[in-house]
Structures are given as C-alpha cells and as structure tokens.
C-alpha cells in the first residue's frame, strides 16, 4: 500500500486502514512523480561530483588546440606539467636542536 492512498480512521475496535481506490488518476500521477523524484535524487547523490564538475567547467577538457602547431602544443603541455610539479628548492629545511 502506498502512503498516499492510506487513511487511518478510528473505529470501535481500534485504528483501521481504509484505502481509497488506487486507480484514481491523481494518485497514479503522484506515485509516478514520487518514484521519479526518488530515482533522480539517488542518481544525483551517486554522481554529484561528475555532474556538477561538468556544469561548472563545461564539456571541454581544456583549451582548443585546433590549428596550433605540434611544437606549440608540446610546449604548452610542458608548461602545464611544470606548473603542477612541486619544486623542492622553495622549501627550507629547519632542524630543531
């Protein structure tokens, strides 16, 4: 039984459930919307990093290299990699006595 169709009414013997007809179009529409909402919420929680990263940065993975010579592409790749690499020369070693 769906929670949308279940109604509890007091009787002499206690609480009893009287369910309305489940073929009511409004009940069917509400059930379908509820199920779709649940599915979308689950998918959102499972894939939120991927979804929002795509919305934030777009579908492109980087600047377009169309029409750029291969030597310039390689130079750009090296610049990007060197920006990511950590240079140990910038850190000072401090020894405590």
UniProtKB/Swiss-Prot annotation:
Q: Which residues lie on this side of the membrane: Virion surface?
A: 1-22
State the compartments where it is located.
Virion membrane; Host apical cell membrane
InterPro entries the record matches: Flu_M2
Site: Essential for channel activity, possibly by being protonated during channel activation, and by forming the channel gate and the selective filter. Where? 37
Instruction: List the keywords (alphabetical).
Output: Disulfide bond, Host cell membrane, Host membrane, Host-virus interaction, Hydrogen ion transport, Inhibition of host autophagy by virus, Ion channel, Ion transport, Lipoprotein, Membrane, Palmitate, Phosphoprotein, Signal-anchor, Transmembrane, Transmembrane helix, Transport, Viral ion channel, Virion
Main location (coarse class): virion
Its function, per the record, reads: Forms a proton-selective ion channel that is necessary for the efficient release of the viral genome during virus entry. After attaching to the cell surface, the virion enters the cell by endocytosis. Acidification of the endosome triggers M2 ion channel activity.
Q: What else is known?
A: When the channel is activated, one or more imidazole moieties of His-37 probably become bi-protonated.
Q: Which family does it belong to?
A: Belongs to the influenza viruses matrix protein M2 family.
What name does the UniProt record give this protein? Matrix protein 2
């Amino acid at each position: 039984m769906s929670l949308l169709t279940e109604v509890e009414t007091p009787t002499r013997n206690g609480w009893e459930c009287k369910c309305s007809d489940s073929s009511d179009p409004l009940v069917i529409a509400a059930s379908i919307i509820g199920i779709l909402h649940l599915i979308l919420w689950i998918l959102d929680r499972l894939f939120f990093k991927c979804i929002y990263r795509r919305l934030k940065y777009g579908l492109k993975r980087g600047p377009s290299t169309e029409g750029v010579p291969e030597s310039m592409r390689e130079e750009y790749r090296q610049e990007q990699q060197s920006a990511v690499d950590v240079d140990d020369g910038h850190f000072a070693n401090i020894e405590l006595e």
